[in-house]
C-alpha cells in the first residue's frame, strides 16, 4: 500500500514542534476587528498551540509524514 500523502493545505496552516505539539495561527482575525477588544486582537496576533485531541487528528489525517 502506498504512503499517504500530506495535505498541501495543512502544510501551509500547521507546524509541528519538536515535542509533537501542533501550532496554528489564532482564529477570528479576518474581519470585524472594530467590535473586538484590544486584548483579543493582541492575543490573536501570534500562533497558538492546538488542544491535544485536535493536534492528534491533524497529524493523523493531514500530516502523516510530518512536515
Swiss-Prot record:
Family matches, as PROSITE patterns: RIBOSOMAL_L35 (PS00936)
Molecular function in Gene Ontology: structural constituent of ribosome
GO biological process annotation, one example: translation
Keywords, in A-Z order: Ribonucleoprotein, Ribosomal protein
GO cellular-component term (any): cytosolic large ribosomal subunit
InterPro entries with a match to the protein in the record: Ribosomal_bL35, Ribosomal_bL35-like, Ribosomal_bL35_CS, Ribosomal_bL35_sf
Gene3D superfamilies: 4.10.410.60
S-S pairs: none
Keyword Ribonucleoprotein: yes
Domain of life: Bacteria
Family matches, as Pfam families: Ribosomal_L35p (PF01632)
Presence of keyword Nucleus: no
Similarity remark: Belongs to the bacterial ribosomal protein bL35 family.
Protein name stated in the entry: Large ribosomal subunit protein bL35
Species classification: Bacteria, Pseudomonadati, Pseudomonadota, Alphaproteobacteria, Hyphomicrobiales
Amino acid at each position: 500500500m502506498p504512503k499517504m500523502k500530506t495535505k498541501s493545505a495543512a502544510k501551509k496552516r500547521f507546524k509541528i514542534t519538536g515535542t509533537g505539539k501542533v501550532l496554528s495561527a489564532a482564529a477570528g482575525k479576518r474581519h470585524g476587528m472594530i467590535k473586538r477588544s484590544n486584548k483579543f486582537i493582541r492575543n490573536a496576533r501570534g500562533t497558538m498551540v492546538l488542544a491535544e485531541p485536535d493536534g492528534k487528528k491533524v497529524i493523523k489525517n493531514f500530516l502523516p509524514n510530518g512536515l
